Each structure stands twice: as C-alpha cells, then as structure tokens.
From Swiss-Prot:
<dbReference type="GO" id="GO:0005737">
    <property type="term" value="C:cytoplasm"/>
</dbReference>
<keyword id="KW-0963">Cytoplasm</keyword>
<dbReference type="GO" id="GO:0120509">
    <property type="term" value="F:hydroxypyruvate reductase (NADPH) activity"/>
</dbReference>
<dbReference type="GO" id="GO:0008465">
    <property type="term" value="F:hydroxypyruvate reductase (NADH) activity"/>
</dbReference>
<feature type="active site" description="Proton donor">
    <location>
        <position position="276"/>
    </location>
</feature>
<dbReference type="GO" id="GO:0030267">
    <property type="term" value="F:glyoxylate reductase (NADPH) activity"/>
</dbReference>
<protein>
    <recommendedName>
        <fullName>Glyoxylate/hydroxypyruvate reductase A</fullName>
        <ecNumber>1.1.1.79</ecNumber>
        <ecNumber>1.1.1.81</ecNumber>
    </recommendedName>
</protein>
<dbReference type="GO" id="GO:0051287">
    <property type="term" value="F:NAD binding"/>
</dbReference>
<keyword id="KW-0560">Oxidoreductase</keyword>
<keyword id="KW-0520">NAD</keyword>
<feature type="active site">
    <location>
        <position position="228"/>
    </location>
</feature>
<comment type="function">
    <text>Catalyzes the NADPH-dependent reduction of glyoxylate and hydroxypyruvate into glycolate and glycerate, respectively.</text>
</comment>
<dbReference type="InterPro" id="IPR036291">
    <property type="entry name" value="NAD(P)-bd_dom_sf"/>
</dbReference>
<dbReference type="Pfam" id="PF02826">
    <property type="entry name" value="2-Hacid_dh_C"/>
</dbReference>
<keyword id="KW-0521">NADP</keyword>
<comment type="similarity">
    <text>Belongs to the D-isomer specific 2-hydroxyacid dehydrogenase family. GhrA subfamily.</text>
</comment>
<dbReference type="InterPro" id="IPR023514">
    <property type="entry name" value="GhrA_Enterobacterales"/>
</dbReference>
Amino acid sequence: MNIIFYHPFFEAKQWLSGLQSRLPTANIRQWRRGDTQPADYALVWQPPQEMLASRVELKGVFALGAGVDAILDQERRHPGTLPAGVPLVRLEDTGMSLQMQEYVVATVLRYFRRMDEYQLQQQQKLWQPLEPHQHDKFTIGILGAGVLGKSVAHKLAEFGFTVRCWSRTPKQIDGVTSFAGQEKLPAFIQGTQLLINLLPHTPQTAGILNQSLFSQLNANAYIINIARGAHLLERDLLAAMNAGQVAAATLDVFAEEPLPSMHPFWSHPRVTITPHIAAVTLPEVAMDQVVANIQAMEAGREPVGLVDVVRGY
C-alpha cells in the first residue's frame, strides 16, 4: 500500500512516523512537486492542483480537517483537480467537538454575563452595574446541525439556554428546536439574540452572514463565526455594528488569513478576534481515524466521513 501526505502547516515527520507505526507494512511518503509515483491513498490539506489531478488510481483522498471546501473550491476552479470517482473523506471529530464546545461556551457566557461591556467600562474606569440578560430572552441560534453543531447545541442547552438550529435538511436534536430549508431560515433568525455559524462552506452558504440576515435578528444581537470567513460579508457586519443592530462579534475565521494588519476589525471595540483556533486537528486522534478508515476501505467497507462532493460536505 502506498500513501502520500501533504500539509502546508503540519509537521510532516510527526505524521509520517505516526502513520508508519500504525501501518507498518505501508509505504508512506511526503509528497513533493514532481512526485508522480503510484499511490493508493492521499492525505492532504490545501493540496497543489497537480498533486491529485492525474491520480486516477487512488482509492481515496483524505482531507485532514473537518471541512473540504479548499479542495472542492479548487475543483470548481480547475475541473479535474480531484480525480473523478475517487472517494473524498473528511475528519469527523478528532477532538474538535470538545474544543468547539469550550470556545462557544466561553464566548456565549462572556456575552450573556456582559463581560465584554464591563471590559470596555474598565478601560474608562467606569463603575456601572448593567442590567443582566435573562435566559428566556436570550435565544441562541446555530447555523449548521452537523457533528459540531449538534455538539455545541447540546452543551448550550445544558446551561439552560433556549437553543435552535437551522440546517439544509431536518435534524432531530433533543432539547433543541430544529429548522430546515431556505424557506424556514427567516423563522429561525427572528427572535435570535446570539447567532453562531457552524455551516459547511458551499456556494449556497457563502455570504449567508449579511445585512439582510442581521436585520432580522433581535436588536443588539451577537455574532460568533467559527466556520469559514467566506460565510461573512465583512462590510455588512461592520455596518450592522455601527448601526447598533449587532452589539458585538467574535470571529475566528476570515476571508483573508492572516487578517491584514490594517483591517478595521483589529481596532473595532466590539470585535473579538482569534486566529482560526476554535477547534484544531489533534494529530494523534486524526491519525487513528484516518488509519481506521483506510483499513475499512481495504476491507470493502464505507469510511466514516465520506463526502458528497455535489453537496460539498
């Protein structure tokens, strides 16, 4: 079995040695430009166009993250980048659910207890108690009800919040109100005080966080974007905050990363920025999942995390 690995950020040595210890009979190598030697499986993140284009012999391509938008965007721009008929598999969790829960709970409670406002008051040396938010008037809406969306919804419900989710197709989540389909999006948005985006990035979801959506939220709503920067129209968010429609936003992902130093988000008092760290891939857990999927495919079984390339997730 031949496996090729490419990731522009991960430490290749850690992955190569970890995979080799789990698959001792496999030939595993780091892919470099000009490498056209045979491969059965490719483990990639943001692969160069030429890496996969001619590899019709591949049994599977593994995206080393929860999202596959980078690969599918490249396929849309350069058809044939992803060999036709080759299964595309994404990581399902690899420790991301817990990390995402931690990030979201910390951020939600910061807004719910108005810590962001007290921090601004501290800078002004202002001692002024604020009216506390009430659970029954602080409905949380989650765009996306996949593995991460469900995990976050369950955790927030444990804190006594009213939680609702919106997704492309209906989902059943205990203790959470579910909305599905484009026609139900307005009903989902109306009454939402804090909106969390956990949607997959597809052509249909790009730009979904826009002025039209913001205008339907409760006044002084909060935004948390931890999915993809392409979901957010940044100018629309700035306008909504400056108009008072959106009270504050926590953003982990951006249209351009790293965020340019002159971007207005950096200096906006109501924007909290984190450098795409809400949930990161944990190598050891990810390797276990990839290897288990390779073994399943070798045995003729369907892997966990198989992507529908038409839907985009």
